[in-house]
Amino acid sequence: MEELQRYLKMDRSRERDFLYPLLFQEYIYALAHDFGLTKLIPYESMQILSYDKKYSSLIVKRLIIRMYQQKHLIILDNDSNQKKFLEHNKNLYSQMLSEGFAVIVEIPFALRLVSSYQGKKMEKSINLGSIHSTFPFLEDKFVHLNHVLNIIIPYPIHLELLVQNLRCWIQDASFLHLLRFFLYEYHNWNSLTTQKTNQNLFFFKENRRFFWFLFNFHVYESESIFLFLRKKSYHLRSTSSIAFLDRTHFYGKIEHFQVVFRNDFHTILWLFKDPFMHYFRYQGKSIMSSKGTPLLMKKWKNYLVNLWEYHFHFWSQPDRLHINQLSNHFLDFLGYLSSVRPNPSVVRNQMLENAFIIDIAINKLDTIVPIIPLIGSLAKANFCNLSGQPVSKPAWTDSPDSDIIDRFGRICRNVSHYYSGSSKKKTLYRIKYILRLSCARTLARNTKSTVRSFLKRLGSEFLEQFLIEEEQVLSFILPKRSSSSQRLSKERVWYFDIIRINDLMDLS
């Protein structure tokens, strides 16, 4: 137990105690603005809010004073213009302060990360596991596993618990007090992990970096114990497959697990012995897979329930943890339906004058495209109806024909690009058909003609031109031993940039 406490003890010698004054430094907001322009995170122009992108300490000070005075919260129901104006100001306050919070709150973690590797050689494959390690895991090791534990990370976390966890890293009371006030003030505008609605979409979009940081910090708290178990037990040594995704790593801080491990710790470690245990996560969903027995997975499930209950004061619902056998169930992860299927084959073995026929079943990874959810997403975006019948896109009829073709082509290429790792690409033909015919109907509606006459006048080449690019890219990657069409439909190609288009369901 003492060894565990020494491991969980923080190195407080490098903590920065004074972060509140940084809120009034103009360069902090310049960094936030540059980050929005260079890190490929959507950043709306401040001209929308009648603001000229010039930050100053005086403006920030006024915003903080107004927040504390709460004058902007007095909304008159009879005055709709006053209500719109106050909501407009609330958006401006939240965006400016959250941008400052996002930059400042990352400083202690960034300093600790840099200082921890001073004079040391960084082992990138171990310490900076990313989503890219998931692809070789699926191809090389996933087929040898038997059971999988689907985990939905617990949410929503209470805002006070989130601030208390940050207190272990940041000791500036003024900064934490303002952060607590800010979170409580705007928690109705956006939840850290729940689905986005129309009324909080603006808040999430304009403050994405800040809330991604808070969400990643919460996720780190929920899975940090795996770091300790991996270091203490050689049974959890699969570092190439233990991938803490989202690249947000905070080292050295784990505490309050004494309640879970209040008994003999070595005995508890023995309960989780498994030489083939793997853990990986993407966003709010994580997977634990094992070659062991269902009893072992049940032990891990009970452990996670106790961890969430004692550490996060969260009562876990039964639907957040599912134990499935890979041979009988599909794994819904990264937008794919993955499963392990035995692939029987016959081998003829010749030994001197005797010949033997051996039946061998080799496990094969199947990654299937979820067609029904994709069609539902297309229907939600008004590309087709719920039965998959293509319809025109009325919202795009005011655009030029070239822009319409480019939009449809970009969506179609993104779908092909994202699901290039599928083992059955022919299932995407229905999605491509919906997009092609929807594009044709939109163009025909734009020119006030029928689809038949439009296709007869222009031909079908204009529908093919935005589908060729993806096939050309694959033709350069794959060997040219066989026909390109057969090759493209059978080969799995994992692109490292698919997380950029993981919001594939948001096609509008």
Curated annotation (Swiss-Prot):
One of its GO terms (biological process) is RNA splicing. InterPro entries: Domain_X, Maturase_MatK, Maturase_MatK_N. Keywords: Chloroplast, mRNA processing, Plastid, RNA-binding, tRNA processing. GO terms for molecular function: RNA binding. GO terms for cellular component: chloroplast. It is found in: Plastid, Chloroplast. PANTHER family: MATURASE K. Usually encoded in the trnK tRNA gene intron. Probably assists in splicing its own and other chloroplast group II introns. Belongs to the intron maturase 2 family. MatK subfamily. This is Maturase K. The lineage of its organism: Eukaryota, Viridiplantae, Streptophyta, Embryophyta, Tracheophyta.
